[in-house]
Structure formats: C-alpha cells, structure tokens
C-alpha cells in the first residue's frame, strides 16, 4: 500500500535508456579522466595517454585535451599533440595558453613559419604579452627575417626588462649580422641578469673574438668551462683560439686535458691533430685523425677523406691537414 501511494504521488519518473546511458558514460568519463591524471603524476605516461584518449572518445572535454597534450609532449609525440591542439584552437580560438602551447609544439616539429600566425593572434588579443613577442622573434630568426626578429625581441624586452633569453637571442642575431659591437651590450645585460648561465659567457667570448679582443674571448671561454667542463663548443673554441695564436704547445696540452675528460670526443682528437700537424708532428697528427674518424665515421674529417683514400695505411700521413 505504501509503495502504491509513493508511486502515485511521486513526481520523479524512471530514467529513459538514453538518460541511463548518458549517466553511465559520464561516470566512465570521470573515472578515465582522473585515472589518467593520477597515472600522469606517477610518470605512467603511456597509460595516461590511453585513459585520456578513451575519455575523449566519450566526451570532448577541453581540460582533458590539455592533459593529453602534456602527456603526448612528454612522450615525444609532437605530431599527436599538434592534432589535439588544432582541435582545441577550433573549440576556443581565443584561448591564449592553447595558442602558445601550440607554438611550442610547432617549434618541436620545425614548423617555425606556422608559429608567426599564432603569435600574431595572441598579440591581437593581448599586445602586452612579452612571451608572444619573443616567440615570434624566434620564429622570424629561423625564417630568414633577422630585422623583424630584432624588432620583436626589442618589444619583448620593453615589456619585460629582465628577459634574459630575449637579450641573448638579440645578441646572437646581431653577431650573425656582423654587428658584434652592437651585440655586446645585450650579452653583458644577460650576464648581469643570470651570472651562472654558461651560454652567455660562450656568446660573449664569440663576440669578443669577432671584435679582435682575443684575451677577453679566451677568458670567457674559460669561464664557460668552469661552469661546465663538458661544454664541447667552449673547448673547441678555446683550442682553436690557441692554434690561431700559434700557441701550439698550449693547444696540444689543452686538448690532452679535454680528451682525458671526454675520451670519446672525436672533434677534440681532430683539432689536436691539426695542432700537431702545424708543429710538424705528422705521425701524431695522423693518429689523432684516425682516432677521430673511428669515433665519428660520419664527421667532417671522414667526409674530407671520402673518395681520396680507401685504406689508412696507404694514406699520406697529415695530408688531410
């Protein structure tokens, strides 16, 4: 009797099959989404991707797409990340963070020309976004528009005066345009802002060398190596500078130390061989060249020899130099 009156006066109706399915799908979606979040936090990226993908098959959810993009990026699946980001931009074309995330993925895929349109869209929405100016400058640099890049980086710096990366990039571009004197103040500012950044000292060394300030360049290369003894470029620049100054014994001793530290550093053997050759030690030069090619058969030294010699034993020792 009680059940009769309950059903008689109740305003609730039994759920339709469609409503039951929607409720079930929502529950599955929530479980998959948050299982994916937990897996992602635990470093189980493959499982997280599976969870997010299955969740999105049930429901197109913007937040879940964001998680999936992050997981794809960690898994080095940039193409898959870009597909998701493209859909996110379709859903919310004015979402700034999504646009900037897509820019990062486009850089990963070497699609630098496509970056500019996204940056311009962000700047239409928010012209004070220093990161968008910086990224657009970076894209213009790699797409053969150095003047446009400098202009964009200058705007980024005006908006964020402590933007170390922008100073460094502008200095790199100016140096590439043979404007070393103009590049120097930018790299000096970068060092002031981040005194422990090895790449700044390396760049300043290259600028000093371009200006003919060889002692200052040498000091900067040494500072770079003090910050990171394994910086290959700094090691090669230091050795090359010693060779250029005809300080051959010092160059050989320096490369001895480099090779002791990194026995597999093929280019160090080649450069030590060059110094030995200039000193008249053809035998030592040949042995260094041989070791360099053994370590890196696809390197510059091997390419120079291609088609000239088929056997090291028949090769004129030191001839490559």
Predicted regions and their residues:
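Helix-start (N-cap) detector for alpha-helical repeat units in TPR-like alpha-solenoids
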Residues: 29, 62-64, 96-97, 130-131, ...
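Canonical tetratricopeptide repeat
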Residues: 34, 67-68, 101, 135, ...
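Alpha-helical adaptor scaffolds
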Residues: 70, 104, 206-210, 222, ...
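Structural signature of tandem alpha-helical TPR/SEL1-like repeats
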Residues: 43-50, 75-87, 109-121, 142-155, ...
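Terminal, low-structured helical/coil segments at or just beyond the last alpha-helical repeat
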Residues: 2-21, 286-321
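Short coil turns that delineate tetratricopeptide repeat
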Residues: 26, 59-60, 93, 127, ...
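Alpha-helical segment of the N-proximal tetratricopeptide repeat
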Residues: 24-63, 67-74, 101-110, 138, ...
